[in-house]
């Protein structure tokens, strides 16, 4: 079964890599206030026709469609930071010889 949905993708003004997918016709009107407080001002990143064949960077079209149909939105969180990479930028606290 083919499903088509016109979605608007907003990026967060507070968190890099956080995106909110919503149905274009509804926009951000029905997003819970608590989520919008944490998300910040939604900055429109793109509008797209979402189908089961769509290619998305860090989500599947099925999950995005399901989230929008059930909750009115799909929240894509930033990727987890690799702890090893974070350690490269820490100031050493003990001498290593």
From Swiss-Prot:
Pfam families given in the database record: YcgL
Domain YcgL: 5-89
Record-linked InterPro entries: YcgL-like_sf (IPR038068), YcgL_dom (IPR027354)
Domain of life the protein comes from: Bacteria
SUPFAM superfamilies assigned: YcgL-like (SSF160191)
Transmembrane spans: none
PROSITE patterns: YCGL (PS51648)
Protein name as it appears in the record: YcgL domain-containing protein Mmwyl1_2530
Annotated organism of origin: Marinomonas sp. (strain MWYL1)
């Amino acid at each position: 079964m083919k499903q088509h949905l016109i979605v608007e993708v907003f990026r967060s003004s507070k968190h890099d890599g956080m995106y909110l997918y919503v149905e274009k016709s509804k926009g951000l009107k029905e997003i819970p206030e608590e989520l919008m407080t944490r998300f910040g001002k939604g900055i429109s990143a793109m509008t797209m026709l979402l189908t089961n064949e769509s290619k998305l960077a860090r989500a599947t079209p099925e999950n995005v469609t399901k989230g929008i149909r059930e909750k009115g939105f799909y929240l894509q969180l930033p990727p987890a930071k690799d702890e090893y990479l974070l350690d490269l930028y820490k100031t050493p606290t003990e001498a290593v010889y």
